[in-house]
Amino acid sequence: MSGHSKWHNIQAKKGKVDAKRGKIFTKIGKEIVVAVKQGGPSADSNPRLRDVIAKAKANNMPNDTIERSIKKASGELNAVDYETITYEGYGPAGIAVLVDVLTDNKNRSAGNVRYAFTKQGGNLGSTGCVSFMFQSKGQIVIEKKDGLDEDELMMMALDAGAEDFESEDEVYAVTTSQEDFGTVREALEAEGLEFLEAEIKMVPDTYTAIDEETATKFQKMLDVLEDDDDVQNVYHNAEFPEGWEE
């Protein structure tokens, strides 16, 4: 599988982050609210909060912004209650898609997600229609830089408990079990490494190759979903064409 195909979304996001940084921070802030409500404001005793903080740092969210979000969440006893929902369905050409939302209005979210699917020739499905094609895994993505030795990094990751290590185009990708994600992430952080991504994700068992026409339609669908304030994550099994650019 080509590096561009598998890691297309990561590479594409790098160019969009500045334009959408405020929206990304808002979404992560919602995740912090949910994590604090579930397990309290201390990252030491709240694994979910630790994971969200790692995601925030990978997205260059400033530490003071993270801390303000935690304090705000812990102080708002009457804060908005967000509901976590995962929608499943098919994009153009039958691409399997999972959409995670955090919402205070599930009717609004359902309508918006359904519109994004149908606009590009896809459709929402019933619960379980595609989730069996994915596994929950930890993924840590590190940008290739001068002075970062691939073999040393691989041994570091595997010794810490990683399941897999890949070198793809401009990045190294470390995959872990959901259970070992925190341990591996902390081991790499202790070595001074910075991450492009560090989070628990739904990873497809296999990828489906799509042509350029389908890739263009699907990217439009992804853009609509990712622009929705309620949508936190979008996972899919599409393998984009080699050399394709939106």
Swiss-Prot record:
GO terms for biological process: regulation of DNA-templated transcription. The keyword Transcription regulation applies. GO terms for cellular component: cytosol. SUPFAM superfamilies: YebC-like (SSF75625). Belongs to the TACO1 family. InterPro entries: Integrase-like_N (IPR017856), TACO1_YebC-like_2nd/3rd_dom (IPR048300), TACO1_YebC_N (IPR049083), Transcrip_reg_TACO1-like (IPR002876), Transcrip_reg_TACO1-like_dom3 (IPR026564), YebC-like (IPR029072). Keywords: Cytoplasm, DNA-binding, Transcription, Transcription regulation. The keyword Transcription regulation applies. GO terms for molecular function: DNA binding. It is found in: Cytoplasm. NCBIfam families: PRK00110.1, PRK12378.1, YebC/PmpR family DNA-binding transcriptional regulator. It holds the Pfam family Transcrip_reg. This is Probable transcriptional regulatory protein CLM_3478.
